[in-house]
Amino acid sequence: MDLPGPIHDFLLVFLGLGLILGGIGVVLLTNPIYSAFSLGLVLVCISLLYILSNSYFVAAAQLLIYVGAINVLIIFAVMFMNGSEYYKDFNLWTVGNGFTLLICTSIFGLLITTITDTSWYGIIWTTRSNQIIEHDLISNSQQIGIHLSTDFFLPFEFISIILLAALIGAITVARQ
């Protein structure tokens, strides 16, 4: 989306805060329904970030597949679970939580140092200079369609056969 700088930055910060708060909600909320709704918020914010970076096809696929199907399936599965088992034994802190906190904190620290030490200016200019000339002639979804019907035709058909076999297997297992 071609927005002025301050509006783009505001939306980027707003969506980033939505991602962070939704992620915290997924991890910290004890009710699985609320946790699934927080996951839906995270997936919608990711889709809006794709729109903000001019990837409209990926944003539409994110909304349709993850928010529309996967999150609804998670909520559907959570509603069938027994909700009383989550409130019986609630330990505030265990050894596994401390170990996980240590690993996640160290990964976060390494990620922050990597981001601050990387020269992003050179990366931006090298990706812009290597753009394909076809980019201006046809849209992203047309490029995806052309590649799926020419270069990736065989893998695309192979994946569709594997998904069909998995669907038939799931129906067979569900009937038994």
Curated annotation (Swiss-Prot):
Its EC number is 7.1.1.-. One of its GO terms (cellular component) is chloroplast thylakoid membrane. It is a multi-pass membrane protein. The chain crosses the membrane at residues 10-30, 32-52, 61-81, 92-112, 152-172. Pfam families: Oxidored_q3. One of its GO terms (molecular function) is quinone binding. It comes from Morus indica. The keyword Protein biosynthesis does not apply. Keywords: Chloroplast, Membrane, NAD, NADP, Plastid, Plastoquinone, Quinone, Thylakoid, Translocase, Transmembrane, Transmembrane helix, Transport. It catalyses: a plastoquinone + NADH + (n+1) H(+)(in) = a plastoquinol + NAD(+) + n H(+)(out); a plastoquinone + NADPH + (n+1) H(+)(in) = a plastoquinol + NADP(+) + n H(+)(out). Gene3D superfamilies: NADH-ubiquinone/plastoquinone oxidoreductase chain 6, subunit NuoJ. It is found in: Plastid, Chloroplast thylakoid membrane. InterPro entries: NAD(P)H-Q_Oxidoreduct_6, NADH_UbQ/plastoQ_OxRdtase_su6, Nuo/plastoQ_OxRdtase_6_NuoJ. Belongs to the complex I subunit 6 family. NDH is composed of at least 16 different subunits, 5 of which are encoded in the nucleus. NDH shuttles electrons from NAD(P)H:plastoquinone, via FMN and iron-sulfur (Fe-S) centers, to quinones in the photosynthetic chain and possibly in a chloroplast respiratory chain. The immediate electron acceptor for the enzyme in this species is believed to be plastoquinone. Couples the redox reaction to proton translocation, and thus conserves the redox energy in a proton gradient. This is NAD(P)H-quinone oxidoreductase subunit 6, chloroplastic.
